[in-house]
Design a protein with these regions (language model features):
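A glycine-rich helix N-cap at a beta->alpha junction
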Residues: 1-31
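Short, structured coil segments at secondary-structure junctions
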Residues: 10-11, 35, 91, 144
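Glycine-rich phosphate/pyrophosphate-binding loop at beta-loop-alpha junctions
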Residues: 44-143, 183-229, 239
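General beta-strand structural signal in soluble alpha/beta enzymes
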Residues: 16-17, 39-42, 71, 97-98, ...
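Short beta-strands and strand-loop turn motifs
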Residues: 10, 37-43, 119-121
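A conserved regulatory-domain signal marking ACT and ACT-like small-molecule sensing domains
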Residues: 204-288
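Receiver (REC) domain switch/active-site residues of two-component response regulators
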Residues: 13, 67, 146-147
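Active-site-adjacent helical/loop segments in soluble small-molecule enzymes
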Residues: 134-191
Length: 288
């Protein structure tokens, strides 16, 4: 939604078709054939690849002794251009591409040594949800890139949350895959590492979910369900324990009617803010 709204805001006519890049591109070719419109390639074009290769030159200008570079791969334009620039200047620099586990098209294509149609599952990294890599980009990447690795949505979520909280960067899921890999698979000590953060087009609703999931993963947002006797003061006893632990109640759902709640009892589900895992574990222990 964020990308669509922004594009329409600049005056473009946006036609929504398909659930991933490949399906949308197929429709775009139909429209171009019917109307005579010009197709502008997203990645599989020499000029697009060359333009994105400027990123590689800028990396070398800022950090000429870099050891490893991590960057996202969808169709492969960014990776192909960057790896050409890097390897031309210094073949010893390691370039690692990162894809979503839901759309591992370039990963599988390089592995099979032939362009391979893969993927189709949903991923929050919609910017790299490409089922088939480009012809030009595949040939470049299979010959020059050192490695392609995969990450899942949970790892991407953690990376986005870390970028927002620590760096104050809003990076879209597809752009955060490099950091997502490094968080779970730490680089060798002493290495000079560059991570390319590509793109900031992220929907605000998704961003809210990312924040909640990031807080939950760190036990800073805690969901608890307790079964209480349905009598005056029972809930207050729970609240007193939470207050003593210096946690904050964000939301409460009080349920007497569900079939799994016995007569004379009440189920209470609470969302709590805590300071982290240690405080959360201490609170749970106090409530047991």
């Amino acid at each position: 939604p964020a990308k669509v709204a922004a594009t329409r805001g600049y005056g473009a006519n946006v036609i929504l078709e398909g659930i991933n890049y490949d399906e949308s591109y197929s429709k775009a070719k139909e429209i171009a054939k019917e109307t005579g419109a010009t197709i502008i390639q997203a990645f599989d074009d020499p000029q697009i690849i060359a333009a994105q290769g400027v990123i590689g030159l800028e990396i070398l200008e800022d950090l000429p002794d870099v050891d490893e570079i991590y960057l996202p791969i969808g169709g492969g334009g960014l990776a192909a251009g960057t790896v050409i620039a890097i390897k031309e200047k210094n073949p010893n620099i390691k370039v690692i591409g990162v894809q979503s586990k839901s759309f591992p098209s370039m990963y599988e294509s390089v592995k099979q040594n032939v362009r391979t149609l893969t993927g189709g599952d949903r991923t929050i990294a919609d910017g790299i949800s490409v089922k088939m890599p480009g012809e030009i980009t595949f040939e470049i990447i299979k010959n020059l890139i050192d490695e392609i690795v995969l990450v899942d949505d949970e790892e991407i979520t953690k990376a986005m949350f870390l970028l927002m909280e620590r760096m104050k960067f809003v990076v879209e899921p597809a752009g955060a895959v490099g950091l997502a890999y490094l968080i779970s698979k730490k680089p060798s000590p002493g290495k000079k590492v560059v991570v390319v953060l590509a793109g900031g087009n992220v929907d605000m609703y998704l961003l809210g979910q990312i924040v909640d999931k990031g807080l939950a993963a760190m036990s800073r947002l805690l969901k608890l369900s307790v079964l209480l006797p349905d009598r005056p003061g029972a809930f207050k006893e729970i609240v007193d324990i939470i207050t003593l632990a210096n946690a904050n109640i964000v939301e409460v759902v009080h349920d007497r009617l569900s079939s799994d709640v016995n007569a004379g009892s009440a189920s209470v589900t609470m969302n709590l803010e805590t300071q982290g895992k240690e405080q959360a574990e201490s609170l749970i222990k106090s409530l047991e």
